[in-house]
Swiss-Prot record:
Cell compartment(s), UniProt: Cytoplasm; Cell membrane, Sarcolemma; Cell membrane, Sarcolemma, T-tubule
UniProt organism field: Homo sapiens
GO cellular component: cytoplasmic side of plasma membrane; cytosol; nucleoplasm; synapse; T-tubule; voltage-gated calcium channel complex
Gene Ontology MF: a single term: identical protein binding
Biased composition (Acidic residues): 64-78
One Pfam family of this chain: C1_1
Main location: cytoplasm
The gene coding this protein: STAC3
Gene Ontology annotations of biological process type: neuromuscular synaptic transmission; positive regulation of protein localization to plasma membrane; positive regulation of voltage-gated calcium channel activity; skeletal muscle contraction; skeletal muscle fiber development
Listed Basic and acidic residues bias regions: 212-242
Protein name in UniProt: SH3 and cysteine-rich domain-containing protein 3
Cited function: Required for normal excitation-contraction coupling in skeletal muscle and for normal muscle contraction in response to membrane depolarization. Required for normal Ca(2+) release from the sarcplasmic reticulum, which ultimately leads to muscle contraction. Probably functions via its effects on muscle calcium channels. Increases CACNA1S channel activity, in addition to its role in enhancing the expression of CACNA1S at the cell membrane. Has a redundant role in promoting the expression of the calcium channel CACNA1S at the cell membrane.
Residue intervals passing through the bilayer: none
Amino acid sequence: MTEKEVLESPKPSFPAETRQSGLQRLKQLLRKGSTGTKEMELPPEPQANGEAVGAGGGPIYYIYEEEEEEEEEEEEPPPEPPKLVNDKPHKFKDHFFKKPKFCDVCARMIVLNNKFGLRCKNCKTNIHEHCQSYVEMQRCFGKIPPGFHRAYSSPLYSNQQYACVKDLSAANRNDPVFETLRTGVIMANKERKKGQADKKNPVAAMMEEEPESARPEEGKPQDGNPEGDKKAEKKTPDDKHKQPGFQQSHYFVALYRFKALEKDDLDFPPGEKITVIDDSNEEWWRGKIGEKVGFFPPNFIIRVRAGERVHRVTRSFVGNREIGQITLKKDQIVVQKGDEAGGYVKVYTGRKVGLFPTDFLEEI
């Protein structure tokens, strides 16, 4: 064959089926490549200003979680002690006292330019304005019954009125101030008084034996005379009234009312004459009124010497200390010291001495 024949000879041709299968393979490869590129996207390229741009062209924002700081548990403060609450407090209101009144806290009179004070709406307790803090925890014992009258002859110790609230509701006519004083004195000295009840004063025992031995001697000169025997019997208790511990030139009178709580207590009203049998104990004396014998506190009586007279105050009076006058309340017991001068007389209350008008005194 010549060169022309070789050049002009036809090229070998592939069948159509093989061509189509090759195209299908290319398409499949391209499809796989497109899915792979979607899965593996390149990270966003940073811009000149430092912001990252996503595939869509918008900026990408990053969210950072804040770290929670662990707070230290603070120690709880100690619990506060429970505050006392008064379930029945006083209901004080401003009050103008036309007549002089005593403060139930400090026992001073509300007079002169200080007539303005406080009065409880229910129990009618009178106090100064500056004394209100002392009765914040004091319970009010309610409205006073219509038949209740305060015994102003009793000593004024009103800083302790808690023990007498129940007694006042049960016995409407008892003085709360006096009940507090009486209960405190009796409970404080109860043990001493028990031992004292069994022991008798030897001098008093001798005085009791003397009348028994003197009875037959007194009956001899009056044989057959029954009146003489009665007189002798009447003289016998009079001999027992002699005070072995004191001189016979004086006697004792009750300043305040003392109400007996026990069987061996001596009950007496103010102004009663008392015969002292035993005064060996400083806190409890043994006395006699008529046929009654018992114990009582010595600060409830006053000694009256020969020539002195006992009076009862018929009207309250506010005295001027600058001129030696004394302030007394109604129904108070006093002892006269000296004679009258200018309508005034010198009196003694057991604690204070001063001048008092005779028009307001009644001799007992």
